[in-house]
Structure formats: structure tokens, C-alpha cells
Design a protein with these regions (language model features):
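Structured, non-membrane catalytic/scaffold regions adjacent to prosthetic-group chemistry
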Residues: 2-201
Length: 201
């Protein structure tokens, strides 16, 4: 059985006002927003692959992934459409565990999903205990509407960077814009700097 640890985030002692990025409003609900139809991927057909810039790769089945050490991060999430949800509870695997399985010197990574969605990220933003591959939300398996069976969780960036239905990470030497980034969204997406669209500082 996989071990459990709480992750580096916990319930913050800061006031809710201090935790709300500019231009955001708090919500108790969990809105569903997607770029296209919702894929339904059975866990017996699910796999996750990390590929280096040289083509070397490491893959995990569902059983192998859920047997890895598990963390339970409690984090605030912020959508580019201006809602924020505080103290969301997840369970999954630190991306440090998965990315350490391949040797890479690349500075960038592209997250790739089962529906063809992609999003680009600096390598530094998915390592150092700040990002996860999660499969449970609030104590229950993650539903397809919210990215199940597994999605990325990168809470310090706008939530479009936390790719739903994710199937892998591909390291790249050059920065390769993803789906929303090519459509005009900001390349990085820091909610505290309101980096919603291309051209925002």
C-alpha cells in the first residue's frame, strides 16, 4: 500500500482576503470548464508517461501510480475566469517522484492530455514540491468532469495549467506554447500578477 504524507500545503493562517488574488472572487462551488468534450478514460486503460528531450521515457499504469507514495495537499485554486476556491483537498503523487524517473536538462515541459489538450510550463514550476498528479478530490475519486481519472495540480498558477485527463509530461529544450497559450492566454499564468492573457505583465 502506498504511504501517505500531507504535502507541503496546509490550511493557511492568513485571512481569506489575503489569500484572494486580484480580480478574483471566492466560491464554494467547483465550476466545470473545459476546452472540448469530456473524455472518459477507464483506469485499466490509463497510463502516464514522462518523456525526456532525448526521447527516453518512463510509464506507469494506474496500479503502479497509485502504489507510489501519496500526498494529500490542501491548496487554494484560482481559475482564469476569476473564481477562486479555498482549501481544496486532493490526493496524489508529487511530480517530483515522477519526473525524477528520467534524466533531463530541459528547462520546459509540455503536459499532454487524452483529449489532445496541451499546456506548457517551466520545469521549475512542476518540481520542488509544488505540483502533483492527483486522482482524488475531497476524499473521492476525481470525476471525469473535473479531470478524472487523474489531472495535474499546480495551484500557484491559474488552473488551466493544471491539465485535466493528463496522460504525460514531455520535456522540451524550447518553450512550446499549449492550447490556450496559442489562443492568446498568458504563457505563464501567475494569478497574483493577473497574467490572464498574452501581453499582461
Amino acid at each position: 500500500m502506498a504511504s501517505l504524507s500531507p504535502g507541503f500545503h496546509g490550511r493557511s493562517s492568513r485571512s481569506l482576503v489575503d489569500r484572494l488574488p486580484p480580480g478574483q472572487y471566492p466560491t464554494e462551488s467547483f465550476p466545470v470548464l473545459s476546452a472540448g468534450p469530456t473524455p472518459h478514460v477507464p483506469t485499466e486503460r490509463w497510463s502516464f508517461t514522462v518523456t525526456s528531450e532525448t526521447g527516453a521515457s518512463r510509464s506507469w499504469t494506474w496500479e503502479e501510480m497509485t502504489a507510489l507514495p501519496q500526498e494529500q495537499p490542501v491548496v487554494d485554486i484560482h481559475c482564469v475566469t476569476r473564481w477562486s476556491k479555498f482549501d481544496t483537498r486532493w490526493q496524489g503523487v508529487s511530480l517530483d517522484v515522477l519526473t525524477d524517473a528520467v534524466r533531463t536538462s530541459a528547462d520546459f515541459v509540455v503536459a499532454e492530455s487524452f483529449d489532445g489538450y496541451t499546456t506548457n510550463l517551466p520545469r521549475a514550476d512542476i518540481t520542488g514540491g509544488r505540483a502533483w498528479l492527483v486522482h482524488s478530490f475531497d476524499g473521492y475519486p476525481l470525476s471525469p468532469d473535473h479531470g478524472g481519472p487523474a489531472r495535474l495540480l499546480i495551484p500557484h498558477l491559474y488552473f488551466w495549467k493544471s491539465a485535466k485527463w493528463v496522460r504525460g509530461l514531455r520535456f522540451t529544450t524550447d518553450n512550446e506554447p499549449g492550447f490556450w497559450e496559442r489562443a492568446g492566454y498568458h504563457d505563464y499564468g501567475d494569478p497574483w500578477r493577473e497574467q490572464r492573457y498574452r501581453g499582461d505583465l
